[in-house]
Amino acid sequence: MTLDTAEKQKLIESHQVHPTDTGSVEIQVAMISERITKLSEHLQGNIHDYASRQGLLKMIGKRKRLLSYIKGKDPKNYQDLIKKIGIRG
């Protein structure tokens, strides 16, 4: 459910805007999307884990807000990010 350092570094390298970028919106969306994927897999086997389900819904909401920010700021970048991460926009 959490990302280890190697996974975070891999996501940062694949979504960097510039060489020293570690926290741009694109990276934040990529990390949240990866956490959502892991948490969804966890909830497949642990149906009654309501606390994790609530955390999942909060993460989905945060990702949605970040994506709407990117969509308003740079629509082309938004489309590229959606395709790269593999989620519906």
Curated annotation (Swiss-Prot):
Keywords: Ribonucleoprotein, Ribosomal protein, RNA-binding, rRNA-binding. Pfam families: Ribosomal_S15. The lineage of its organism: Bacteria, Bacillati, Cyanobacteriota, Cyanophyceae, Synechococcales. GO terms for molecular function: rRNA binding; structural constituent of ribosome. It comes from Prochlorococcus marinus (strain MIT 9515). GO terms for biological process: translation. This is Small ribosomal subunit protein uS15. One of the primary rRNA binding proteins, it binds directly to 16S rRNA where it helps nucleate assembly of the platform of the 30S subunit by binding and bridging several RNA helices of the 16S rRNA. The keyword NAD does not apply. Belongs to the universal ribosomal protein uS15 family. Transmembrane segments: none annotated.
